[in-house]
Amino acid sequence: MSLAPIPSDDPKEQLETAEPESGDPKDERVQLATASQRQLIWMRFRRHKMAMIGLWILILMYFVAALAGFFAPFTTNSAHSTHAYHPPQLPKFSISDGFYVHPSEGRTDIDTLKRVFEEDTSEKVELGFFVKGEPYKLFGVIESDRHFFGPKEMGERFYLFGADRAGADVLSKLIYGSQVSLSIGLVGVAISLVLGLILGGISGYFGGWVDNLIQRFIELIMSIPTLPLWLGLAAAIPPTFGIVPTYLMITVILSLLGWTSLARVIRGRLLQTRDEDFVLAARLDGVSTARIIRRHLLPSFMSHIIATVSLSVPAMILAETSLSFLGLGMRAPAISWGVLLQDAQSVKTVATAPWLLIPGIAVVLAVVAYNFVGDGLRDSADPYGKRSE
């Protein structure tokens, strides 16, 4: 009876015994031996199935958000009050007409006093790809009137995800809202990352009274309840502020508390590694303090930084959505997922128009995808971590 080999924690031995994905095992070992740190991280990340799924979901979401005007069937200002709370329409297909839907006319039911829409089966609204529709500016510069999918005739309406109380297309507003909700997480985390790296790096590398001062400041910020502080600062934003100033203010507010955990992680790791031999050798070689931290110390615990940052993005997306949902974040006419969810605050409204909760599904999907990617990056950047299957 043969015994199974005991797995080793040595990263070099893990690379030597790694199973190749395809091709000659010897060529794979040579590739692993000569690969850079980024290449090794990417090789391990590709084996993490859920992380790859999350990555493709995020790529698709950001791609659609970047080209919102093209993918949205209508612009954000396009609304028809007679189509308020129009239910979602499922496209039909025929060989002669292609994709189409039947137009609907709304009326108020006398018995239930509910808004009811009845299809006119004698008429058809033909749908197509790359159709000419309402004009828009791509990236705010390029003028175009082509839409990925929508009615072939100008003026006709089609509601794949239904309509809101103003009669605007929920799908179009969902796509435009992703620009704010998805970008505010990245911008906010970028600000938090810079603050965390600078203050955490100074605190952990120099120590002494500088460390005590920075840590007491961090503890003071962390002792303040997060949600009440966010609510107070967001409520202080004047309602007369424009969309861009409000966006910047909300981003800064969300970043004020996001950097503390990252700074403490960096500080703790620097305290452990600042007296290592390779750091002493760099000092004797005349390397500057900034270069020692950037090139020698930070890469040694990059997995912790990646994990903290990747988990901070969905937290900021949820924070922006919560503030906007409560009316303290982005406000109309600005569009974000939180602003769209304001229409779903009433139980009566949700009961009659459940499709208004679709922006909430988008929030959950983005948060879960970010968590999957964060787990995959953390495991891939840790050479002593267990290889993901």
Task: List the predicted regions and their residue ranges.
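Alpha-helical transmembrane segments of integral membrane proteins
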Residues: A163-E389
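Gly/Trp-centered helix-boundary motif
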Residues: M1-L193, L197, I293, P333-A334, ...
